[in-house]
Structure formats: C-alpha cells, structure tokens
Amino acid sequence: MKYIVNTSNDPAYNIALEAYAFRELVDEDELFILWINRPAIIVGKHQNTIQEINKGYTDAHDIKVVRRLSGGGAVYHDLNNLNYTIISNKADEGAFDFKIFSQPVIATLADLGVKAEFTGRNDLEIDGKKFCGNAQAYYKGRMMHHGCLLFDVDMSVLGQALKVSKDKVESKGVKSVRARVTNIVDELPEKCTVNEFSDKILEKMKEFYPEMTEYVLSEDDLAKIQESYEKQFNTWDWTYGQSPEYTVERNVRYPAGKISTYANVENSIIKSVKIYGDFFGIGDVSDIEELLVGVPYEYEDVLAKLKTIDTTLYFSHMTTEEVAKAIVA
C-alpha cells in the first residue's frame, strides 16, 4: 500500500484527485489518502442534488456542493472534518464489507480511550451516535472505499445545509439530524486537533500496513487531476444535472436505502425514467433507466423486465421485487 499526501481544501479538486487515483493509478494495488475540505456538501452519485440541500443556505454561506463517485447519502464537510480514502485492486475480496476498512479508525480511537463500533449498513458510532459514514465505488475490478469523520464539525451548519427527508428520520426512530450524530472531539478524554488526529490515523495505517510508502504525484498526474476538476467535478452539469421530466413520482425507503423514481409515462408506456437515491451498488443505474424504456407501466411488466438482469449489482441488499415496487405500485 502507498499513501498520497493531499493538502488541498478545495472539495471539487479533492474529489477529482480521489477519482484520478481510483481510475488511473491502476498499477498501484492499494492507495490511502487523507483529506480535509472547506465547507461543502458532498452528495452521493445517485442523488437528486437539489432535493438534498437547502440551496438558499448553501449559496448564502458559500458552501460548495460537489457530487462524488460513490452511492449513499449527502454529507456536510468543513475544515474540522477528516476524510479518508482506501483504493484497492482486490475488489472481490471485500465487496461491500465496510466493516473491514473501518478497523484502522476504530483502532485509532481505542488508543485514544474511545470505544467506537460499526453499526447499520455503513455507520460508525460512539454510544449510539454516528460520527462516520462510509461508501464504496467500483470501477473495472477496482474498489474505492471512503469515509468522512466528524471530528469537530459545526453541527448548527450541518443541520441547516442538509435536508433530511421525514421518512429517513422516522426510519431511524429519532427526531433530528443533530440527535443522530456526534463529534469525535467531544468524546475524547484528552483533546487534540483534527490535524493531530489525522496524523494518528496515518500512523495506525502504517501499523496495519508496515510496508506502506508515499506515492508522490507527478506533474503529469497533477495536470490530469486539474483537467478532470475543470471538465467534470467542478461543473454544474456533474453536480446538479438536468431536472427530469416526469408524470409519476414515487419515493420508497427500504433498510438498504431510499429509491426515488421519476417516470414519464404516456399511454401507459414508460417513455423515460430517472432513478435517484442513497442506495449502494456496483452498476450505473442509467442501465436500468434505459432497460425500462418502452415497458408498460405495470408492476408485473416492470418486474419481468428487471428479472432479465441482476438488480443487486445496482441496488445492494434489495430484492428485484422491492426495486419494481419503487418504480410502480
């Protein structure tokens, strides 16, 4: 394993750097990156951005909005938020096992006198309060796992910048965003800064991987990262995309995540459909959207079409029947 030192605080640039390491540095079997963003909302690959953020608030407070490559939900970052990325060519060995990659974080906190545990489908918690969410993405047999650690994030901003749907709050059985999360610094017996904590995470990674050395980005690497930053990750089209035309909207939440569908139906035939949500999956849901064009807008017809493919590649831990019900009642 090698680690990349990244001192940038630009959210779109940091996503571009991470994406470059993931998609282009394929000769490196394993890579590790720690990074910190200025105030930003990072939305999941499949989310409808405008429904996840309070845009008036983010605009007024200069909070950058960026879309990442992995699924899952939207998260708020600031300069007291620590993000980590692990990239591996061993995609098949730990597919969707978030727990394995969270162990260095849990071990670091144990050294600092804090007991953390892995819960739910992708959370790390201290005494039932979430401090880290994780997500994964896959590309040509390569896997990227990343997490955001709430170290000393401004909770008042977090609660105002993000929209949290009523169905998600109810499914968690709690009243608000702030009730569900904690800052690591508030749990530490002895306080430290986010940069000191970052150093401790890197030290722990070196214990887990004694042969780990630094990968220094070349001028060519940096030029290509800058190009993807300008052409993809810092663009309006990537972050917001086009608002879907639709005649039928459905929103369904399962334990494995939420699916929102916007279907344009004419004469009972699906002309187009857009699928959003905080679910996880290896495949690109545009495959599903294209598959359903021309299918009668009836549950049995949609289900039959979906059964021609392996839907778990796109919607992890969901049945084909559940996916069909998210599209048509």
Locate each region found by the language model.
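Flexible, glycine/charged-enriched surface loops at secondary-structure junctions
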Residues: 113-121, 209-222, 299-303, 314-317
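N-terminal lobe of the biotin/lipoate ligase/transferase fold
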Residues: 1-96
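Short beta-strand elements
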Residues: 135-136, 149, 252, 259-277
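A conserved active-site cap/scaffold subdomain adjacent to cofactor or substrate pockets
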Residues: 158-159, 168-214
